[in-house]
Regions:
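Short Cys/His-rich zinc-binding micro-motifs
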Residues: 1-10
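Core segments of small alpha/beta cavity-forming domains
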Residues: 19-60
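A short beta-strand motif that forms part of the nucleic acid-binding face
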Residues: 19, 92, 118
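Secreted/processed peptides and extracellular or luminal domains of membrane proteins
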Residues: 10-12, 21-22
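Beta-strand-connecting loop/turn residues
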Residues: 2, 84, 110-111
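Short beta-strand edge/turn micro-motifs at domain boundaries
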Residues: 98-118
Length: 118
């Protein structure tokens, strides 16, 4: 079983695949962020669109031709199973550089959704 690209060191089939396929929801904001990173790696624009809050979501999600190399979570504030909001700061490395971002998440109808980034 291939390792999940989210960095969990768990097999993809038991980690982010059930979230990508809609079989279960992310329990925390960090889990949603990791599933979104894995979706970028695997070209799962469908998951990126579904997990983006409708208030801030673009009409469609386009994926750039990027070779993603790894993810490091720096800080998580809130975003737990009982929270309504949360932020996750991370560094995503890709061939030729890196992206450092603080993503904001909010619950909508009980589901974690990506809101925007600072």
């Amino acid at each position: 079983m291939p390792e999940c690209p989210c960095g969990s060191r768990t097999g993809y089939a038991r980690c982010c695949a059930p979230i990508h396929d809609g079989q279960r929801q992310a329990v925390t904001a960090e889990e949603l962020m990791r599933s979104r990173y894995a979706a970028f790696v695997l070209g799962r624009a469908d998951h990126l669109y579904r997990s983006w809050h409708p208030r801030t979501r673009p009409p469609e999600v386009e994926l750039a031709e990027v070779r993603w190399l790894g993810l490091t979570v720096i800080e998580v504030v809130g975003g737990g199973p009982e929270d309504e909001t949360g932020t996750v700061e991370f560094v995503a490395r890709y061939r030729g550089g890196s992206l450092r971002e603080r993503s904001r998440f909010a619950r909508r109808a009980g589901r974690w959704m990506y809101l925007d980034a600072e």
